[in-house]
Amino acid sequence: MMTRIEVLFPEFCSLFADSSNVRYLEKCLPDAEFVYTSYMDEPLFVAEKPDLIYMGAMTESAQEKIIKKLMPYKERIAQLIAEDVPMLFTNNAVEIFGQYIENEDGSKIEALNLYPIYAKRDMMHRFNCLLRGSFDDIQIVGFKTQFTMAYGDTDKYPFIHVDKGTGMNKETVNEGIHDHNFFATYLVGPFLVLNPLFTKYLLNDVMKLDVTLAFEPVIMEAYERRLKEFLDPKTQY
């Protein structure tokens, strides 16, 4: 049976080279079908169960449009999460699944409210940092560039335990959301290219495929060099 991967709203959700996550998956899975769902389309996941659902970074205005687009499918998304359908969301896509997003003036954009977090925007101050952490026994590296921090119960569904850098906010070592096969993280890079061990875990353990990573010797060498750099005490986070 052909593997089907749904890429949500690629015309909006490709900031910070996040589209390279999908391009890398295409190289790893040359026989898979990639369904690119535009904003005007009904998502594939409404009637079917894709083998993976992916959405990347977007502008704040696009984020508000996408919340409105997905709100009618909130219960369906919750059902798919409970049924272990693999999902990966990067950068500010994570905020769509929280309770709300708060603007500087205190006004709130209601989100899907699937997880007990909320985000606060600070559009005059972009936050950037490196991050090193772990998911189970996999070491994770990446970059953050964002106008928001997330608060609330960040302990309930943590994805990455942060060793160096900043978690969902400056007071927590938890980064992202992990629930069943739902993974969401603020990290960019692109995430799957920077973290081949997690990509291998996603494809083979979560999606139950049996694949070899594309360009594995090169991408592993780059990962090991970056990990060494991130482990250097002189590296500034």
Whereabouts are the PLM-identified features?
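N-terminal beta1-alpha1 cap of cysteine-dependent amidohydrolase-like domains
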Residues: 1-79, 193-196, 200-237
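Beta-strand-turn-beta hairpins that frame and shape the catalytic cleft
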Residues: 2-3, 136-140, 177-183
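Structural motif
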Residues: 52-56, 88, 184-186
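Cysteine-nucleophile active-site neighborhood
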Residues: 58-134
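Glycine-rich nucleotide phosphate-binding loop and flanking beta-alpha elements
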Residues: 60-61, 94-96, 149-151, 191-193
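Pocket-forming structural segment of enzyme catalytic cores
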Residues: 104-175
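A glycine-centered loop/beta-turn motif at secondary-structure junctions
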Residues: 169-207
